[in-house]
Amino acid sequence: MAMTAAAVTVPLGVLLRREVTSERMERPDVLCGEAARSRKGEDFTLLLAEAGERVAGDPSTSFSVFALFDGHNGSGAAMYAKKNLLNNLLRAIPSGLSRDEWLAVLPRALVAAFVKTDKDFQAVAETSGTTVTFVVIDEWVVTVASVGDSRCILESADGSLYHLSADHRFDSNQDEVQRVTACGSKVGKLNLVGGPEVGPLRCWPGGLCLSRSIGDMDVGECIIPVPHVKQVKLSNAGGRIIIASDGVWDDLTFEMALECSRGFPSDIAANRIVNEAIHPRGLRDDTTCIVVDILPPEKLAPSPPTKRQGKIVFNNMFRRKHTDVSFILDREYAEPDEVEEIFDDGSAMLSKRLAAGYALQSMFEPFSCAVCQVQLKAGQGISVHSNPLQHEKLQGWQGPFLCQSCNEKKDAIEGKRPPRDS
């Protein structure tokens, strides 16, 4: 009779410790480091280890925010987004939510905050624009919203690589090329008179090589501020997040950035990544990097590697050396280090993005604009749905609702109006 693989018997002590850990999972330590080399002065960062509290006055509900803004055609949009985006996010989240509810509405609130920030900045009538990569860390849950090409990656404690942001460069995203051309704009390289096409793919009018950003009011309305949002949950082994501008990613692959910084504390790691990026060809662009380590509580900071490289060194970042029997047993029968995907949506349809999670939010804020949060009288708002009569399950509310100006913004984002310069 053929023998099957025997099931692994896990000691009772290990099982009991797992049960206790799952019931009382401690908050991680969040450590961050930043490095930047400036050429144009258009990169800005936001580093807030304690950005706010889900429950006012309760420090145990604090969350962290780390963001990178890579401006272009001036620094105005990047500075404005840095100053206003977090406040717009907090206004879009109802009060009185449990932690699970807060995390559930966070992706929708991020979309609203990005769109409001863009709408308000364009009212200033300045033509600069900016990428945004905005990271919210609540205990072991990481939520990333991004427009542009300031990429964000995660390396888990076992060395697995996860992409937490999208790349909205036309050269890298055929779906965005199709979306923009369907809206009536053209995508192509710079065409020199009498010569070949040169450079990256760009959107015309405007010549921007990104399909999503905040600002950029001088280009067609097909360049939108609706972010890609991804939410994941780390295991209690932790992980390392790297956020960097294209000054880094134009010269380093994700693996190269991880390799040159692995095993070092976050501040040293960020410096090593920036130096590695500018070493081959010198400083050609603003080059900025943020490194965030999410560590099991009370774990020692990593030491620089000597001869050892690779995943073993990275794993040492998250574990102290132990000699007691219980630790040896825990390591021998350790559960797999997994990163759980909770949410992932990069749709450009603002109505779809705002409707996600609305049933929960409508319990708290049924009559406010889903973008700017202005209070609406009953029957005053405009439903995001193209045909509200098809949505009887919303029991007459037919929400979410928008004010008149935000509804015009939605129509522009969804290509229901021609580009400004057409």
Swiss-Prot record:
Q: Any idea which UniProt keywords this protein has?
A: Hydrolase, Magnesium, Manganese, Metal-binding, Protein phosphatase
The reply to whether Transcription regulation figures as a keyword in the UniProt entry is no
Pfam families recorded for this chain? PP2C (PF00481)
Q: Which Gene3D superfamilies match?
A: PPM-type phosphatase domain
Recorded GO terms, molecular function? Answer: metal ion binding; protein serine/threonine phosphatase activity
Q: For this entry, list what GO says about its biological process.
A: regulation of intracellular signal transduction
Listed name of the protein = Probable protein phosphatase 2C 69
The lineage is: Eukaryota, Viridiplantae, Streptophyta, Embryophyta, Tracheophyta
